[in-house]
């Protein structure tokens, strides 16, 4: 068997529809578009969300909420992800170096998800109550 001799099994691939190629094809003349109207024209069709001129649902409904700018640069870190960090000190830069969080993250919070089996020192990160208990139970400590 060679790469240049590979081919799909017989009958597994159907040929694409060839539209506008005569009456006998079943898709001749209007090519399956019907007669006249906007959708039969080249480039015909309406934009996403257009409702024929009536007030669209998106505009009929009220605006609500907002996107916190801080949330865009904040990350949650699970306990089991702390195992990827080399060394005993876990801080923002250590998490970035271990590719646990991306470079644009400015704040991180450690949450209780999974387990931690080695003592680590957490510096300058927020920690949930459950994660704090798990880190201290493993012999680690948290420094604000």
Curated annotation (Swiss-Prot):
One of its GO terms (cellular component) is cytosolic large ribosomal subunit. Signal peptide: none annotated. InterPro entries: Ribosomal_uL15, Ribosomal_uL15/eL18, Ribosomal_uL15/eL18_sf, Ribosomal_uL15_bac-type, Ribosomal_uL15_CS. Residues 1-49 are annotated as: Disordered. One of its GO terms (molecular function) is rRNA binding. Belongs to the universal ribosomal protein uL15 family. This is Large ribosomal subunit protein uL15. It comes from Shewanella frigidimarina (strain NCIMB 400). The gene is rplO.
């Amino acid at each position: 068997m060679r790469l240049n001799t590979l081919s799909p099994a017989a009958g597994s691939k159907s040929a694409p529809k060839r539209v506008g190629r005569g009456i006998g094809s079943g898709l001749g003349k209007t090519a399956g578009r019907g007669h006249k109207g906007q959708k039969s024209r080249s480039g015909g069709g309406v934009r996403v969300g257009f409702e024929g001129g009536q007030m669209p649902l998106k505009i009929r409904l009220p605006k609500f909420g907002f996107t916190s700018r801080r949330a865009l640069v904040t990350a949650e870190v699970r306990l089991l992800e702390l195992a990827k960090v080399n060394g005993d000190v876990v801080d923002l830069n250590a998490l970035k170096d271990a590719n646990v969080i991306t470079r644009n993250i400015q704040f991180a919070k450690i949450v209780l998800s999974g387990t931690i089996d080695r003592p680590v020192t957490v510096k300058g990160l927020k920690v949930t109550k459950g994660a704090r208990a798990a880190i201290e139970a493993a012999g680690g400590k948290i420094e604000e």
